């Protein structure tokens, strides 16, 4: 049978006809719906989003709250606006509609976690900042601390860089010269579990308690702030399966440019000639050496990170559950550095009886950190004249005159031969029973358990390294076990009297006990290097260990009072007893009080769209810190030692006094005053918070002044409570909703200013700390900030001998050397001319995040930075010193080589007779920076695309972390440690990431 074929011309005509008729048919099926959107008071709502459900068809209301939209007569309108509940209205052919939006109480009364309870944000009288999972979900990092960096005012976070290492967190400045880390509380259990052990996908929210009115409930551990972490829980409804996968690439940023082999040989010749030594005759023509080896390029690599999480949650009216498992695998940007982590989270609650509810949380993680013996400093200093390996396959290294060929060991070989592994296992759990006596009275009892295990295993084989061989194989192992038990019992009372007076009360007790067991050993001389068992070691090099314990017993109470939601009062008190102190100073009391006035609730307050809510706050409280106190600091301590004693002059074991007893040692205390206000403007489109604080640490632990006749020196480890530190500053946060509707745009801004000063050290003599090349870099002294840099002030370079002769006596100085200022005008450059040369503490922390959304697309751009701080670039001591056989950065190509050639980079001279590399402002650099911290572009697929696959939600994201940095700092990255010293730090990485999220 012959098939009929339609002529092409007729086919084209039919297609055109259908194309013309189809829009007409669609238009015939649509109607124009007009209407107005109002709130419950009858006021029109301007800028509300009006969308046809299931489509991208929509508009926004005008200045009179009116709208007009062409849509299906049987469609559904979805009307939404910030601060109001979203309304769905079925059109049913109607052409005129009036939509009334009701206030969203959940949005207006966000609940924050404050310790032993929760509180509506509108009822807060203290300084609390919060972020949710939505604020961190797109950060392509392995550490929760990295994800929250810059997003909370008053909180400084410094990334360690190395995979698996914890960030450093400081809240409202450095409150002590000792440990000033905040207390971390996970699901109600205080813990020293690092944030790197948590899976970010399991975190529901994070609340930071900053002022004493909210931290005093934790008494002797609240002085440095409290970080409250709440993990996810199930909600009522059918089970939900969530799957997320993230794949990332990482590389180092701003790697210093180093000299090649030819450039180094030329520099070496200059160093030799200028110091009166003979240059290497083999380098008479440096250009013949070519480029040589770039050791930093050999050490660094492109890192890869994979992060996967699967969770399942759900529940009914009587029980809820959430369970998840996570796996992270990260190869660092430094060769041989690897990190792997498994996590498990299980949260559940059950209303077993009308008056009895049980809930539990389990957080488990197992991680492994591996690395060889990498050394960033050696890679910067190693000479480019050597290959990575010799022709026979052995590792190369310096061989010969060390003044020419150097003494820095091959920096790549140890990363492959030496082995270092740390295994950690963390188990944090709690079980809570909640008894409800009446609607207004409850009792909670929580048992918490926190177990941590760390196992370190280092193996170093013998090898004929040049210039110094490793002659003995060694293996070091250590086991560290920590167990903490917690039992909290407290009553919760919440009742409103006469419809105006609301009273909340929490009162109870807490008991905590910790034990720690540590053991380590090292054996040398292994018969077989490939058999690493300790039994294979022939020589016991060292063995040691200890067991310690501490306990804390506490009684605490908090009362909240509210009169008509206008006048608010919060008062807390906690009494702690710690085993770490002597009997007469074992107990401490920590009170606080704060008040707030919600002016916007007053009858006379204008009811308009400009100011929706205004609350003024003030508070004062005293908190404590025992973080810097050892478990037995109040007791005298002794060490065992061996001394020749007796007629036979044989060695006898004896006890040697190490520290004096101090039964009067007690807590460091922090008294803090806080005032602030919160404002909501323009129908909650603008929300602004401001806080000003004065934070004074007293009874800070400092070295005790002890008469030398006691047999102890003033520099021993005996401490007393006599120091004082002051921090004062302001915090601001601003959230704006700039656009709503089809195109959405929100902005978050934070800014923090802090000024730090030591008020008393119990000594007129400064403390000098942080020694580099046998010289102290950092000073602690009265009336200066903590950790200021202390050294000489430079004044250019001597251009000729006449300038040397007319300057103050400066031993070793010649033309081309650095000129140092004679600050005391005594005609001699010596230690008396040292002064404060820099402050590592930033004055300002700031950030800005912009989020835009359009038809399923979301774009987030996050900026973060600090200002007002200095960095001591200790790497440049060796890498621009031009005083030894180390490689240098290309900055030295602009060195002084004759009168007028440079006034900043000195001459190259071996041995450094003028001490050009002494601690001075030559190595102090501006640490301020503005970083494009994160850019994320994501797309949420339309639901109609996913229905057939039974996928509820699917999201694709592309992200880049640490995109670009504007800074004047010359090192790898301006984000160095809290002390501001940059020396051999693991580089901060730039991360490119692809993420997929599915919900079923």
What do the PLM-derived regions correspond to, one by one?
Residues 136, 181, 275, 303-306, ...:
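Extracellular/periplasmic, surface-exposed regions of secreted and cell-surface proteins
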Residues 145-149, 719-726, 767-789, 836-848, ...:
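C-terminal extracellular loops and terminal segments
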Residues 284, 467, 539, 578, ...:
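Extracytoplasmic gating/loop element in the C-terminal half of outer-membrane beta-barrel translocons
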